[in-house]
């Protein structure tokens, strides 16, 4: 509930202006509800209009993307780039290619990115972009032509010191390669304008694994500090089968857990013997197939239709790694009833407000997305550093830096929670720690 007058006034203004953007409103309200003790302690934020400014993007770019498919037909999609806040560094955030991409979705992701990037302690502002283009079922040539058309417009708005996009859902190494090539051709320059690049042309080792590994490093540290516990011997329920889910499963198993599920938009796999990550990688990364094929290849595993069913599986730890709002209140209650005591988010905003309420009422250790899945953008920041230095670090060096960053995020979140009288609250702590750094920078730089 919003009780602070300043916060309530600003939120009402956001609703009046952006009432047709439900995902964005949800993200803003979740953050605002936890910022009330922060705003009360810092009256200078109201005087400087920090809340009014932080919820309004510095720039919203929306454009047509016209391209030709393999049959010679002209196709038209929408492209977006939200340059949300540059108070602590150049805009930084991924590109998502998915039919569900709208201005509201990109805006909520960009808003979350401001605080997420702040939490990494690296100098990166918040941004996000994408298109309603769906690469699934498209040939490599069609994906290439779309990426080239998309970058033809985007190239005039980005740069290594201005805005550095990365990948997100359906934007992996293939797409980043096509986008980077087109930027290089148009701008006639070779720079670190994108992250998630191939190792042959400026990418970083451990970038592919970063988000999933980071989720597990965060979870392991939160368990250690708050419960004197670890992944060892735990049963883990994971949703999704993309980059984040796959490498979260891999790292959880390395840390001694047994991962029993993965899913996609059609259904989920239950493997009581533990998910074989190499089979998942072969199906999803190499063959670009559907997860149901796992059951055809791994004896003893089961495929079930309906992705929401994954939350009915018994476990100790749940890592939602698929998409926004995948866990509603009913699903959260099923998780609790099935013994889950830890929920850490790998996807962006995968839990609805009702689900978060269930976690809090039942004493679930809850790690919010903006903190827990910051590993991807953290290693993107490390890739930017390597590009600037014109050198490459080893996998072990990058992985060690990632682990240190995730442990620092837990420590900073808990310190902020304690400072604002909500000891142990990782959600309030993450929002407060991320916000205060950006807010102080905004105050120092004047009204912009």
Write out the residue ranges for each language-model feature.
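Adenosine-phosphate binding glycine-rich loop
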Residues: 2-27, 222-223, 334-448
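Glycine-rich phosphate/diphosphate-binding loop of Rossmann-like nucleotide-binding domains
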Residues: 203-314
């Amino acid at each position: 509930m919003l009780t602070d007058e300043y916060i309530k006034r600003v939120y009402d203004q956001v609703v009046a202006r952006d009432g047709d953007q439900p995902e964005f409103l949800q993200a803003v309200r979740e953050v605002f509800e936890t910022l009330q003790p922060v705003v009360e302690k810092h009256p200078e934020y109201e005087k400087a209009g920090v809340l009014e400014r932080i919820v309004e993007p510095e720039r919203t770019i929306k454009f047509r993307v016209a391209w030709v498919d393999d049959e010679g037909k002209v196709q038209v999609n929408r492209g977006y780039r939200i340059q949300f806040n540059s108070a602590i560094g150049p805009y930084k955030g991924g590109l998502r290619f998915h039919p569900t991409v709208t201005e509201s979705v990109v805006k909520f992701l960009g808003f979350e990115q401001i605080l997420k990037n702040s939490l990494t302690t690296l100098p990166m502002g918040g941004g996000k972009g994408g298109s309603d283009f769906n690469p699934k079922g498209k040939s490599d040539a069609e994906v290439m032509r779309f990426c080239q058309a998309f970058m033809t417009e985007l190239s005039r708005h980005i740069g290594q010191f201005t805005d550095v996009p990365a990948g997100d859902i359906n934007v992996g190494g293939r797409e980043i390669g096509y986008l980077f090539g087109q930027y290089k051709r148009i701008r006639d320059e070779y720079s670190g304008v994108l992250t998630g690049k191939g190792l042959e042309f400026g990418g970083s080792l451990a970038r592919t694994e970063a988000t999933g590994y980071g989720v597990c490093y965060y979870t392991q540290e939160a368990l250690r500090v708050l419960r004197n516990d670890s992944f060892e011997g735990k049963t883990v329920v994971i949703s999704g089968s993309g980059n984040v889910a796959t490498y979260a499963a891999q790292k959880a198993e390395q840390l001694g857990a047994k991962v029993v599920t993965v899913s996609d938009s059609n259904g989920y796999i239950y493997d009581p013997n533990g998910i074989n990550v190499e089979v998942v990688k072969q199906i999803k990364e190499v063959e670009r197939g559907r997860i149901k094929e796992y059951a055809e290849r791994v004896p003893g595993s089961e495929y079930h239709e309906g992705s929401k069913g994954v939350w009915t599986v018994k476990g100790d730890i749940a890592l939602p790694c698929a998409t926004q709002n995948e866990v509603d209140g009913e699903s959260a209650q099923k998780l609790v009833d099935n013994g889950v005591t830890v929920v850490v988010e790998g996807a962006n905003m995968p839990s609805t407000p009702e689900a978060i309420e269930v976690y809090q009422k039942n004493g679930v250790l809850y790690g919010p997305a903006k903190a827990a899945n910051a590993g991807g953008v953290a290693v993107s920041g490390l890739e930017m550093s390597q590009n600037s230095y014109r050198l490459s670090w080893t996998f072990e060096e990058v992985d060690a830096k990632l682990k240190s960053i995730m442990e620092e995020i837990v420590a900073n979140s808990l310190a902020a929670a304690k400072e604002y009288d909500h000891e142990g609250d990782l959600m309030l702590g993450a929002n407060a720690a991320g916000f205060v750094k950006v807010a102080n920078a905004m105050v120092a730089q004047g009204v912009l």
